[in-house]
Swiss-Prot record:
<protein>
    <recommendedName>
        <fullName>Putative uncharacterized protein LOC400499</fullName>
    </recommendedName>
</protein>
<dbReference type="Pfam" id="PF21013">
    <property type="entry name" value="LOC400499"/>
</dbReference>
<dbReference type="InterPro" id="IPR048484">
    <property type="entry name" value="LOC400499-like"/>
</dbReference>
């Protein structure tokens, strides 16, 4: 059985609705009774209750109430609920939600018991949240958030979280705090975490100024870490900037780095200066850089470096300089400290239209000075390349040349290499070639070519070899000859001749050979001619052999 009632809105009161339901179930013993009630007031209240009797050892019931109201700009919503099941669970909950302007708060409290303790609340859990967000007319924004959770049965889950955030045109700050454990709500609790970050921007039209900080604190783990970054940059009257990074761990500097840069360049001048400093438990670095480039003809750069802790290096200087004036070029590279010169390189160069000359010197901490020179000429009738290299105990000179004359027509090519070892005894390789026109007219043409080779190496060829050939054309007497001369080691001379001609209408060929070797196989002096004197097949062979006697 049941009933319901609807009361319309009147007299400033909202519409109200009520209903009740009762159900009985008879099975031979005590009847099982279920009762339910519902009350609803539009816009403000909603209530519900239900009970069950004669089914369990005791009466089971559940109730719920939801209320809403608003007064003086404050809106409130409340929720209450109870649940009881004999021998199983007993629960009571109370919730509250409030909003006033930019502030929102809510809370929830639950008391419960299980099994045999269902009638009496044995445990309790509660949670609450708070949120506030404000926006000012100046563009500032603020946010605050708080959260709490506490359980008597599981204390390790109890915690408190707080978040603050502030932001305006040139400033931003955020902080997060978390407290947990059995003493979560006490200021002396060591089981908490704090994280914060800050950013500032104080820049202007010709200024950039930034600051950033990050903090992490965990007292239980003995962790206190702080990171700070600062940057400043100026753009007028010249460019200058500096940046610094600092990392602290438990109050001690863990890592510190800083850099500065200045650019005072103008239209035709480049001038830079920079400094870098770094300090950590493992390594210390201090570096400075300077660049000076006033115009195209002068350049100078210097780097100074100091290392400490893991590697030790004190006042290392790296200097690079270049200078030019007319056809002259000069460059220097130096790497040194006050006690040691690690590297020194210098070079002087002359560059003209057909001339290149360069002189260089290299010295390091691992070897004494090494000098070198390169000379090159390039013209229509002469080309020369000379390379010279001198070390502490050895010296090398390499020369390649090409010469050409139009009158008398003569061409020379040569390659010379001279090596001086530790003993001071020079050893050289010479290779020369020459082609020369000795005579050229209407009746006589003569041309000579020569090749000379000298070397000190142990090879299956003579250490001195001269090969010379002379070609003669006598147009008046219709006589052509080729003479080949070979001289080995400056003493052993071999001469071979070949003559082709025509006399009185009779063509002839003559050949001769003269050598200084054993004449048992080939006579030392041999000559032979082949002559034709008719138009048929008749031939005459004239030969003469010389072996000391003609």
């Amino acid at each position: 059985m049941g009933w319901s009632d609807l009361q319309p809105a009147m007299g400033g009161e909202a519409e109200r609705f009520q209903a009740q339901l009762e159900v009985k179930l008879v099975t031979g013993g005590s009847p099982v009774v279920f009762t339910g009630n519902l009350t609803r007031q539009v816009g403000s209240k909603l209530a519900f209750s239900a009970s069950l009797s004669h089914l369990l050892s005791d009466q089971a019931n559940v109730t719920a109430l939801l209320e809403r109201k608003e007064e003086n700009g404050r809106r409130v919503a409340a929720l209450g609920a109870e649940l009881f099941v004999p021998g199983l669970v007993g629960l009571r909950a109370l919730g509250l939600l409030q909003q006033q302007g930019q502030l929102w708060t809510n809370s929830l409290r639950i008391q419960y018991s299980l099994l045999g303790q269902a009638k009496q609340a044995a445990h309790e859990c509660s949670t609450s949240q708070k949120l506030r967000a404000d926006s000012g007319s100046d563009g500032a924004y603020r946010l605050e958030l708080r959260h709490e959770l506490h359980c008597t049965q599981i204390l390790a889950f109890s915690h408190k979280v707080q978040l603050w955030h502030e932001e305006d045109s040139g400033h931003l700050h955020s902080q997060l705090e978390v407290s947990y454990g059995k003493q979560w709500d006490k200021n002396s609790n060591k089981r908490h975490l704090r994280v914060s970050q800050t950013f500032k921007n104080d820049s202007g039209p010709a200024l950039s100024n930034h600051f950033m900080e990050f903090v992490l604190q965990v007292p239980e783990r003995q962790v206190d870490c702080r990171v700070q970054l600062y940057h400043l940059s100026l753009r007028l009257p010249y460019v200058e900037s500096s940046s610094h990074l600092k990392v602290q761990y438990n109050g001690r500097p863990l890592f510190v780095a800083g850099g500065q840069w200045k650019d005072t360049s103008r239209a035709t001048l480049w001038k830079w200066e920079g400094v870098l400093n770094l300090d950590s438990p493992w390594l210390m670095v201090s570096a400075a850089h300077r660049l000076y480039w006033p115009h195209r003809a002068v350049f100078q750069a210097v780097l100074e470096l100091t290392l400490g802790k893991a590697w030790t290096l004190k006042d290392l200087v790296v200097s690079v300089g270049c200078r030019s004036q007319g056809p002259n070029r000069e460059g220097k590279i130096q790497v040194y400290t006050a006690a040691t010169t690690y590297l020194r390189v210098s070079t002087v160069t002359v560059l003209a239209q057909s001339l290149f000359h360069s002189w260089s010197e290299l010295e390091s901490a691992w070897n004494t000075a090494v000098q070198g020179e390169i000379h090159a000429e390039n013209s229509r009738d002469r080309k020369i390349l000379n390379c010279w290299l001198k070390g502490p105990q050895q010296e090398l000179n390499l020369t390649a040349a090409y010469r050409h004359l139009e009158w008398p027509r003569k061409t020379q090519v040569s390659l010379t290499a001279v090596w001086i070892g530790a003993q001071g005894q020079p050893r050289g390789l010479q290779l020369e070639g020459e082609l020369e026109e000795l005579r050229q007219d209407r009746t006589l043409y003569r041309k000579r070519g020569a090749l000379l080779l000298r070397h000190p190496l142990h090879l299956p060829i003579p250490q001195s070899l001269l090969l010379q050939e002379t070609f003669t054309a006598d147009r008046r007497h219709q006589r052509y000859s080729l003479e080949t001369r070979v001289v080995l080691n400056g003493r052993e001379e071999t001469l071979q001749t070949m003559v082709l001609g025509c006399q009185a209408g009779h063509p002839y060929v003559c050949a001769g050979l003269m050598h200084p070797y054993d004449g048992k196989v080939i006579p030392r002096n041999t000559e032979g001619c082949l002559v034709t004197w008719n138009q048929h097949t008749s031939l005459a062979l004239l030969s003469g052999l010389e072996s000391g006697v003609q």
